[in-house]
Amino acid sequence: MDVNIFHFLFTKTNPGENFSCPKCKILIYDFDKVSEVYQCKNGSWACKNCWIEIFRTTKECPTKECRVESIDSLSRSRFIENGFAGKNMDCPNSLVRSNPNHYEGINVLLDDDGCRDVVTVGNLSSHLKGCIYAFTKCPNDVNGCTGEFRLKNLDQHLQTCGFQLEDCPNCNNKIIRKSIEEHIDEECLKTKIKCLECGSTVERGDMDFHLDNVCPNIVIPCILCDNGCDLLFKRSELSNHLQSIEHISNLNNKIDELNETLNDLQISELNQKVEQLETLLTQARDDPLAQREINRLISKQEKFKSVWDIKNFSKRQFQKGFYFSSPVITVGHHSFHLWLYPNGETSPSNSLSLYLVLTKGEKTFVNFSISIKNHNGNDLNSTFENDKCLEVGGTRWGWAFEKDFKTGGYLKNDTLSIQFTVAIKKQPLITDILSVQ
């Protein structure tokens, strides 16, 4: 508090001349209490700060009547201190502050709504601690309120303060009072809004999911677009589309195209192997080195290695038991498929299950492995090291994974990529063939 305020607060005469330090001319009041006053043996007095300056410089009392060396050569002037402490004064909170940061004389006026108590200087500090007319900032200043009020009026202000925090009636988040309508109309995730496509009412926070997975009027691709059906239609028409002739025709055309491409590749590869074997066979009977090379080639497993991409994986809804079937995997005279159950086959958990199934050919033994691509570098790998027996309509072999494949780096452009290798059991060595000729 600025000490100049006391020139305006004393109820009767201005005591400044009697209770101002004769050396520095400052009123003997230090913030919230009467300043310490000391006097020399001749009765000459001054405030403590001035005596400290005297000890450092002249070492003479203010009237220059005696020499002083230290505070120990002085005594407290209780007469001056007590006389000042007993003076009556108006409470500082009787004033209006046109500039709330200072109590300069030119900026203070009496306030009809101010404190009317008269107190002594000595009791001023304790009075101010409980004075309900003291000025205080609104506790909502951290939220932007710049108001300053007397304590007695603060509760009334808080009832209407636009920066008071309130619970949103929809989401229960704390929102400042003056912004709560804007929050509800434009931001609140629990506010129900109307879908512009179908007119149904959905919480704002669920609208993206509604549009991506539920809204019947959104145009979507066929769930088998990766397998050749490129038609677009409203989600509400999906069931009818899956039963349509055009959809089935698209799939059949794609299957025929893939089979033709696959057969061309396999025939080309087999022709190369046949040419190598024919060349070696002409030399094998008389050349041991050539015979060993033939054994090496034939002892290799017939195998197929590829990547199966499932697009739009996260945007699809899967019921328990639904599965994707990979394009045909042809190894030798055998045809296989991978079956992927996104939500498991029969397990009550939401594990992803993946099986290798023999769909054409005689009973055979295979080695196979898979790797589910992770774009963060943590591929999920699994391998059946030993030969597994498969037959059409019989045993399947596979895995179940307790992971969320829609997150964690397994999707890129919303596509799940599965690398796989299927190998048929080893064939007899050429030495066995030659031995029976």
From Swiss-Prot:
Keywords associated with the record: Coiled coil, Cytoplasm, Metal-binding, Repeat, Zinc, Zinc-finger
Coiled coil (UniProt feature): 240-287
GO cellular component: cytoplasm
UniProt-annotated location(s): Cytoplasm
GO molecular function per UniProt: zinc ion binding
InterPro entries: MATH/TRAF_dom, TRAF-like, Znf_RING/FYVE/PHD, Znf_TRAF
Main location as per UniProt: cytoplasm
CDD domains: MATH (cd00121)
Domain MATH span(s) in chain numbering: 303-422
Pfam family, one: MATH_2
Zinc finger TRAF-type: from-to: 126-181, 182-239
Upregulation: Up-regulated by Pseudomonas aeruginosa, PAO1 strain and down-regulated by PA14 strain infection.
SUPFAM superfamilies registered for this protein in UniProt: TRAF domain-like (SSF49599)
Record carries keyword Kinase: no
Domain-related comment: The MATH/TRAF domain binds to receptor cytoplasmic domains.
Protein task: Probable adapter protein and signal transducer that links members of the tumor necrosis factor receptor family to different signaling pathways by association with the receptor cytoplasmic domain and kinases.
Family stated for the protein in its record: Belongs to the TNF receptor-associated factor family.
Protein name, entry field: TNF receptor-associated factor family protein DDB_G0293202
Organism: Dictyostelium discoideum
Lineage: Eukaryota, Amoebozoa, Evosea, Eumycetozoa, Dictyostelia
